[in-house]
């Protein structure tokens, strides 16, 4: 699966699966640390991305790697590359 997918100019993100209810679709929450310009304190930002999971292999709680890809549907522009850590 991941051999056929290339990341030419897109971004790669690591996040946790928060939903797998749709067919061949997962929702991944990605956390980033951003430094506040005034307080000089790091703040945790979270964003959700819908990604294409062609084999329906992800479950809620899995840590996954996704890459930017051509649009699959209206909201899906990310593709699952690998499962880094399975949920317990």
UniProtKB/Swiss-Prot annotation:
MF term (GO), any: structural constituent of ribosome
Organism superkingdom: Bacteria
Alphabetical list of Pfam families matching this protein: Ribosomal_S17 (PF00366)
GO cellular component: cytosolic small ribosomal subunit
GO process annotations (BP): translation
Keywords: Ribonucleoprotein, Ribosomal protein, RNA-binding, rRNA-binding
UniProt cross-references to NCBIfam families, sorted A to Z: PRK05610.1, uS17_bact
Subunit structure: Part of the 30S ribosomal subunit.
HAMAP family, per database record: Ribosomal_uS17_B
Name listed for the protein in its UniProt record: Small ribosomal subunit protein uS17
Annotated source species: Oleidesulfovibrio alaskensis (strain ATCC BAA-1058 / DSM 17464 / G20)
């Amino acid at each position: 699966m991941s051999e056929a997918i290339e990341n030419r100019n897109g971004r790669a993100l690591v996040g946790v699966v928060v939903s797998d209810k749709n067919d061949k679709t997962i929702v991944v929450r990605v956390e980033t640390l951003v430094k506040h310009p005034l307080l000089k304190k790091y703040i945790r930002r979270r964003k959700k991305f819908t990604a294409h999971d062609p084999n329906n292999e992800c479950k809620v709680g899995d840590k996954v790697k996704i890459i930017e890809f051509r649009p699959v549907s209206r909201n899906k522009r990310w593709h699952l590359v690998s499962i880094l850590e399975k949920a317990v």
